[in-house]
Design a protein with these regions (language model features):
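Short coil/turn segments that connect the beta-strands within blades of beta-propeller domains
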Residues: 75-76, 119-120, 158-159, 203-204, ...
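A short helix->beta-strand "capping" segment at the edge of beta-propeller domains
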Residues: 45-64, 95-98
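Conserved beta-strand position repeated across blades of beta-propeller domains
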Residues: 72, 114-116, 155, 200, ...
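Beta-strand-rich domains and repeat architectures in extracellular enzymes and scaffolds
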Residues: 57-89, 105-116
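Surface loop/turn motifs at the tips and blade-to-blade linkers of beta-strand repeat domains
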Residues: 59-64, 104-108, 143-148, 185-191, ...
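Signature of short aromatic-glycine-proline-rich micro-motifs recurring in repeat-based ectodomains
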Residues: 68, 196, 243-252
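C-terminal motif of bacterial Sec signal peptides marking the signal peptidase cleavage site
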Residues: 31-32
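Conserved beta-strand positions in repeat-built beta-propeller and related beta-rich domains
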Residues: 80-84, 122-129, 161-167, 208-212, ...
Length: 277
């Protein structure tokens, strides 16, 4: 409780504290991507993840006051959930202009996290309040549900919800009760991947930001194995980076148009990218 109170009093400590993790997390990912697996007869074959390249297809403006925690594109609407104490909102964003229509503002005591749309409901996590807010598609509050631990990223396969909490695990959640139905432990080349953050379901796989890095990993939800990854280092150019610009975070998939969008916390741009081997 004391640590949470400090975070509430000093919101800037959140970014500073988490940034200290970046070198450690990036080092783990580099080792996972480059090291050779140990060979032993009793060890199952380790999947070699595919390193995908990307190209930028289009660039759109993004509100530099939006600390992006969740992003989703559904039926022509770009949904965004943002964080920071006293600034967390759920909003709809006009893709072309970047203008946001705020639908609801969270209490000052809540730090907004991942969002997802499932059917006629929108779900929005909170970081340390152990609470998910449920809204209708107009942003009207319907109910809250409780969960154990922190909330980070959220996505859906069309039936169930999947939630990350900043660890190596992704939990399958019942959308009606928000009770845990299963757990996926994420591994890359046999090594656990920590700090799983924002999530997006794309063609039967879970795409995830790895917090404090420029990596997006592609996870098999049946096994937890990382089958591929994209390194977005350099996506946001140096001239677009300010003192407030934070890490890559936010993946949205336009299923009908086959488009993938990525952005970051307090970034001035949102990118449509094409992924290639």
């Amino acid at each position: 409780m004391f640590a949470e109170f400090l975070l509430y009093l000093f919101p800037n400590i959140v970014t500073s504290m988490k940034r200290l993790l970046s070198i450690m997390v990036l080092s783990v990912l580099v080792v996972a991507c480059s090291s050779q697996p140990k060979r032993a007869a009793s060890v199952p074959q380790i999947v070699e993840p595919i390193k995908y390249a990307y190209s930028v297809k289009a660039i759109y403006p993004h509100d530099t006051t939006s600390y992006t925690q969740g992003l989703q594109y559904v039926d022509g609407v770009l949904w965004e959930g943002t964080g920071e104490w006293g600034k967390s909102v759920l909003q709809k964003v006009d893709l072309q202009s970047g203008r946001a229509e705020v639908l609801t503002t969270l209490p000052r005591s809540e730090f907004g996290e991942g969002i997802t749309v499932l059917g006629d409901k929108v779900y929005q996590l909170t970081w340390t309040n152990n609470k998910v807010h449920v809204y209708d598609l107009q942003g009207r509050h319907l109910k809250d549900m409780r969960y154990v631990g922190e909330g980070w990223g959220l996505t859906s396969d069309g039936e169930s919800l999947y939630m990350s909490n900043g660890t190596t695990d992704i939990y399958k959640m019942d959308p009606e009760t928000f009770k845990r139905e299963g757990k996926i432990t994420v591994t890359m080349r046999g090594e656990a991947v920590n700090f799983i953050n924002e999530l997006e379901w794309i063609d039967g796989r879970i795409w995830a930001n790895v917090y404090t890095t420029d990596y997006v990993i592609i996870i098999n939800p049946q096994t937890g194995v990382v089958e591929g990854y994209i390194d977005f280092t350099g996506l946001l150019k140096d001239e677009d980076v300010t003192e407030r610009t934070d890490v890559l975070n936010g993946i949205a998939y336009d299923k009908d148009g086959g488009r993938i969008f990525v952005t970051g916390k307090l970034w001035n741009k949102l990118f449509e990218v094409e992924i290639n081997k």
